[in-house]
UniProtKB/Swiss-Prot annotation:
Lineage summary: Bacteria, Pseudomonadati, Pseudomonadota, Betaproteobacteria, Neisseriales
Known function: Catalyzes the formation of 6,7-dimethyl-8-ribityllumazine by condensation of 5-amino-6-(D-ribitylamino)uracil with 3,4-dihydroxy-2-butanone 4-phosphate. This is the penultimate step in the biosynthesis of riboflavin.
Pathway participation: Cofactor biosynthesis; riboflavin biosynthesis; riboflavin from 2-hydroxy-3-oxobutyl phosphate and 5-amino-6-(D-ribitylamino)uracil: step 1/2
Keywords recorded for this protein, A-Z: Riboflavin biosynthesis, Transferase
Active site: 94 (proton donor)
Family: Belongs to the DMRL synthase family.
Binding site for (2S)-2-hydroxy-3-oxobutyl phosphate: 91-92, 133
Name assigned to this protein: 6,7-dimethyl-8-ribityllumazine synthase
Presence of keyword Transmembrane: no
Keyword DNA-binding: no
Residues engaged in binding 5-amino-6-(D-ribitylamino)uracil: 26, 60-62, 86-88, 119
InterPro entries, per database record: LS (IPR034964), LS/RS (IPR002180), LS/RS_sf (IPR036467)
Organism: Laribacter hongkongensis (strain HLHK9)
């Protein structure tokens, strides 16, 4: 790459970052796997335990409202937010509805409030697929939140 090009490198240093995490309780065993992997990775990246706020909500459709409340809370500001949940296909159209609406709402929170939102809401056909993906997806969301928080800071500093 041309050395004159401004290149903002990936930064996975979580020191000093405040992260909000919202987890759905529906499909709880999978969500707990996502949670454990995400929180462990946030700590491994240097985020202090006291700089992590963790909240649970009933299901995936409730996650965006909780994230929105975190995003607009000026007294307790966050650098990034994480959504964790699991939507597993059933026999009705409900799977598509929940998956699509939750995903769109998570994106809207990030854009409306100018805050990174890591989407860790798994959408899988089976419990087995969700269980196979939960650990890596949880870690990935932690890395995404830290990297994007640092990128936002680089843009605005």
């Amino acid at each position: 790459m041309n050395p004159d090009i401004v290149n903002l490198e990936s930064n996975l240093n979580g020191e000093g970052l405040r992260i909000g995490v919202v987890m759905a309780r529906f499909n709880l065993p999978v969500c707990e796997g996502l949670r454990d992997a995400c929180l462990d990775e946030l700590l491994a990246l240097g985020v202090e335990p006291t700089d992590i706020t963790f909240v649970t909500v009933p299901g995936a459709l409730e996650i965006p409202l909780a994230l929105q409340a975190m995003a607009q809370n000026e007294d307790d500001s966050y650098d990034a937010l994480v959504a964790l949940g699991a939507v597993i296909r059933g026999e009705t159209y409900h799977f598509e509805l929940v998956s699509n609406e939750a995903g769109a709402a998570l994106t809207r929170v990030g854009l409306d409030f100018d805050i990174p939102v890591a989407n860790g809401v798994l959408t899988c056909d089976t419990d087995e697929q969700a269980e196979a993906r939960m650990a890596e997806k949880g870690r990935d969301c932690a890395r995404c939140a830290v990297e994007m928080a640092n990128l936002q800071k680089a843009f605005y500093d």
